[in-house]
Amino acid sequence: MACKSVLFVTLGFLLSFCSTAKVNKHFFPQNFKIGVANAAAQIEGAWNEDGKGETIWDRFAMSRPERIFDHSSPQVAADSYHKWREDVEMVKEMGVDHYRLSIAWARIYPDGYKTEEPNAKGVAYYKNLLRSLRALGIEPMVTLYHWDLPQKLQDDFGGWLSPKIVDIFADYARTCFELFGDEVKWWITINEPKQICEAGYGTGVFAPGIVSPGVGNYKCAKNVLLAHAKAYHIYDKEFRKKNQGKVAIVIDSNWSEPASAKPEDQEASERALQFTYGLYGNPVFNGDWPAVVKERVAQRSKQAGLKESRLPALTKEEIKLIKGTHDFLCINHYTSHMVSAWYEAPVTDTSLTADIGVNDWMPKEWPRGGEGWFSVWAPGMRKLLNWLKNTYNNPEIVITENGLSDNTGTLEDDHRINYYRDYLSNCLDAIYIDNVNLTGYTAWSILDDWEWSTGYHSLIGMYKVDFNDLTGLGFLGSLLHTSPKSPRTAAWQKILENVYIKQK
C-alpha cells in the first residue's frame, strides 16, 4: 500500500535558524493531499488587459503608492496571465496533488455586476488553466474571492460594507459554478475574511483603505458571511448533484499561546482565538457570533453610550442561512504570538484590538520571518489544529496556506526547509497523536508574488521571480544564467524528496 512519509535527510550545511524539535517520522495517510497555492491579484498581472476591470487593489496601489512598501502595484506581478503554461509546468515539477488558485472577479465581470455574457477572454484564460491542470492529474482548488473586489462595486455602494454585495457576489459565484464546475471539485468562496474586513474596512491598511475601526470591520464580517452562505446554498441546490464538489470558506488565524497557566491568561488566549477565527468560524459551524465576542462588543458599546452594539446582530433567519455552510474546515496559518491578560482600553477606543483586550507579543527567542509580524514557532500549528478540532466538533480540516516569508531573495533558502519540516512534523503529531482529522496541506506560495501592502519586498515562493526581468532577457538574468522564474534550492524539492515520498 502506497504511503507518504516524512523522513528528512540530515542537512550538511548551516541553517539560518536551527530546530531542536523532534521530527515525527510517521507516514501521511494514503489519501492525504499536498498542494501549493497563489492568487490572481498577486501573480496574474495584465491588470487592464482583455476586458478585465479595475479592482480595489489596482486603485489602492496606483493612486496611493505610499501605502505600498516599495510603491509597487500589481500591474504586472509575476505575469502569470501570459505565462500560465510556465506556472502549470512548475506545479507539475513539484509533483503535488492540488493547486490552489483564485479567479479574478473583474476578469469575469469587469464591473462586478452580472451581465448577459461574462468576459469571454477571461473565461477562456481560466478554462485553459483548469483543464491543463486536470490533464496532468493536478486537482484545482479554486477561490472565488481573494481580496480583489471590482472597484465599481466599492464606488457604487461601499463594497463589503453594504448588504447589496451579498446577492451580487452570489450571482458571480453561480456564474463560476456554471462555467468551471466540470473542472473544479474543491471550491473556496472567500479567502480570509478577517483580512478583508479588519485590514480593508477597519484599520484601512489594505484596499479599499476604509478607516472604521470597530464598526466597518463588523459590518463587513456580516456581509461576507451572508455572501459565503448564499454561494454555498447555490452550489448545494443547483450544482452539487451534477459536479460532486465540496465548498468551504477559508479563515486565517495565528495561534495565541497563553503566557502562563493563570486563568486570566488562559481566558485571554481563548478570547483572542474567538475574535480572530471564531468571529467567522462560529457562525458557519455553530451558529451566531461567539458568545464572548457578542458580550464584549455589546458591553463596550454600552459603556461608550451607544444604543446598539457595534457588532450587528444576526437574525434567526440569517443564523439558519449561515450555519452548516461548510463541507470541510479551512485554516491559513503562518505564525504564533504569546498572549496575556491586559488592562481594559478606554471605551472610546473602538478598535478590534481594544475589543479583544489582550496583550500579545513575540518572544525574542522565536526566530523571525521576513516581516515584522512573522515569528516562527511550529508547535503553534499543532495547538491550533487541536483547538479547531475541539471547538468545531472534529471536522475534516484542510490547511489552505502555510509558508515562510523572506526578504533576502536568496536561492539558498535553507531556513525554509527547516520551517516546512517542523510545521509538517507538527501536522503529523496532530494526526497520529491527537487524532485530528487533517486531510490536506497547502504551501504558500508556488512563486514569489506581489504581497499586497509589502509589494515585492516579501518573498515567499518556491520559485524565485526576477521581477525586473520577466522577459528572461535582461542583464541580470543573462549574467546569472537564470530564468526570471528560478527554483529555490531546496525547500520544496527537499520536501518532495524526503517528506512527500510514496513508499511501496
Where is each model-derived feature located?
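A common structural microfeature
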Residues: 31-33, 81, 88, 98
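Active-site region of glycoside hydrolase catalytic domains
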Residues: 20-68, 93, 111-113, 120-504
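Internal amphipathic alpha-helical repeat/solenoid segments
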Residues: 76-92, 110, 118, 122
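Active-site mouth loops of central-metabolism enzymes
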Residues: 69-83, 161-163
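Cleavable N-terminal signal peptides of Sec/SRP-targeted secreted and luminal proteins
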Residues: 3-20
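Short, well-structured secondary-structure segments
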Residues: 97-104, 139-143
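N-terminal onset of structured domains
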Residues: 2-3, 140
